[in-house]
Amino acid sequence: MSYGPLDMYRNPGPSGPQPRDFNSIIQTCSGNIQRISQATAQIKNLMSQLGTKQDSSKLQENLQQFQHSTNQLAKETNELLKELGSLPLPLSASEQRQQKLQKERLMNDFSSALNNFQVVQRKVSEKEKESIARARAGSRLSAEDRQREEQLVSFDSHEEWNQMQSQEEEAAITEQDLELIKERETAIQQLEADILDVNQIFKDLAMMIHDQGDLIDSIEANVESSEVHVERASDQLQRAAYYQKKSRKKMCILVLVLSVIVTVLVVVIWVASK
């Protein structure tokens, strides 16, 4: 089985500043989350070969590269989500609701992918520690066997020379094993550092979800406030129309009364003039 680099999980396109508009960030985050899930599945597949005949330095190298690159991808997505939360809200209440739903779905998907990745990370760490323990035990057994042979076997000068050669070979093998153990211990330290990074991302994500809840409450409050203002404005318009209608009615009555009075005065003046 061949193991390639993690280029297939990196963001396509030229390098440069991250997109700043809402839709582009959403699209980039969605792609990152999908790549995190794919890489997690690949890490799980490589992990299953640890401690088997397929275990090798190449497998260790690819496993470390996959998990570290996936960790960087998770950190990048976390920063993009923070940037997403800092963007100004649209003026339309309907657009605010739509963006709110998109961010909720995105954070849920990211949380799920991140959780699966961390579970696999911890399992890899456990298997690596078991592998180191077995290697150390094997090195100790080799040293004990060599000491036992030195105590039980008597030999002449020729045999002594062969024994010295054998001991040198065993010492070389043991040194190689110890070097491999050191490499795996270094890999475990990096893995545990990456696990701590993921823990911090979870904390940031929890804070963003909390802030998102506050934002949702604010949006709903603004919507309710707008509805109240619309209702009040409607009531005021109805009252204004009522008062205007009532005022017109009074004006009509007043004009009619004045017309009657003027008519009476004209008649009186006309009669008096005769």
From Swiss-Prot:
It is a single-pass type IV membrane protein. Residues 1-20, 128-150 are annotated as: Disordered. The modification Phosphoserine is found at S139, S142, S218, S225. Residues 34-80 form a coiled coil. GO terms for molecular function: SNAP receptor activity; SNARE binding. Disulfide bonds: none annotated. CDD domains: SNARE_syntaxin12, SynN. Residues 178-240 form the t-SNARE coiled-coil homology domain. SNARE promoting fusion of transport vesicles with target membranes. Together with SNARE STX6, promotes movement of vesicles from endosomes to the cell membrane, and may therefore function in the endocytic recycling pathway. Through complex formation with GRIP1, GRIA2 and NSG1 controls the intracellular fate of AMPAR and the endosomal sorting of the GRIA2 subunit toward recycling and membrane targeting. Associates with the BLOC-1 complex. Interacts with BLOC1S6. Interacts with NAPA and SNAP23. Identified in a complex containing STX6, STX12, VAMP4 and VTI1A. Interacts with GRIPAP1. Forms a complex with GRIP1, GRIA2 and NSG1; controls the intracellular fate of AMPAR and the endosomal sorting of the GRIA2 subunit toward recycling and membrane targeting. Interacts with NSG1. Interacts with TPC1. Interacts (via N-terminus) with VPS13B. This is Syntaxin-12. It comes from Rattus norvegicus. The lineage of its organism: Eukaryota, Metazoa, Chordata, Craniata, Vertebrata.
